[in-house]
Amino acid sequence: MRLLFILISICFSAFRAQADNKKLYQQLDSVIAHRADYHALKDKELQNVKLSATYVTDAEEKLRLYEQLVNGYSPYIYDSAMVYVQKGTHLAQQSHLSAYYNRFQMLKARLYVFRGFYIEAKQCLEQLNIPPSDTHQNYLYNCAQSALYFSLNVYCENSEFSEHYKKLFNEYITKALYYYSKQDAQYYRLKGVQLYLSDGPLKDISACLNKAMSLTKPNNPLYGMSAFVLSKAYRKHKQYELQERYLLLAAMSDVMSSS
């Protein structure tokens, strides 16, 4: 579904571009032609994780696999992802593993955000008690909050509420970045998004998002998400040839990651 929106965007932007990016269009055609292969590979990976989760007896290892399945399915296969959120929540409660319980509640909030259930996501996050000393939990919590307010900002764009949600997004994304490794692709993607929303310099946005892309592979959703935000940044600055280029890269990544 996201690929459709990207391709529509390409159609509307292509006539303004100064170059045709022919090689990228040819690559996209080839990637789309093999879409079923990418989907089959992703499905095989998920089936292998499911099989492992069936036979694992250690609670923490099973929870780790459930978390992997949620991340593998979300955000575009909501029902399947939510099944493993519920399984993980139940097992974490049974096993008295509060850290995993919190993590699955944050995953649930993230899924709610993707579906537009903003009140439910907010309520889910408000009931959590995150230990200040747990770096990973604090990172996940602030990421979930920033995703909520990012989506609310987009939803309320050009309204009197937009700036309020943008401010809250910036507060939470700053905290998330504080807790995350600067050697990771996710760090540079988040930093690039923050700079984009705060109207930072284009060269800094480009540096962060290209760094994120260089630290991952085209079949990773992070690659496509980074490329998509960068295309929006170039559009904002009326650099339509580069906008087109990064839309094409985002579209290819979308297919290759089978999201």
Task: Give each language-model segment a name.
Residues 3-12:
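Sec-dependent N-terminal signal peptides
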Residues 15-259:
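A "functional boundary" signal
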Residues 1-4, 17-19:
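Short, Lys/Arg-enriched, disordered terminal segments
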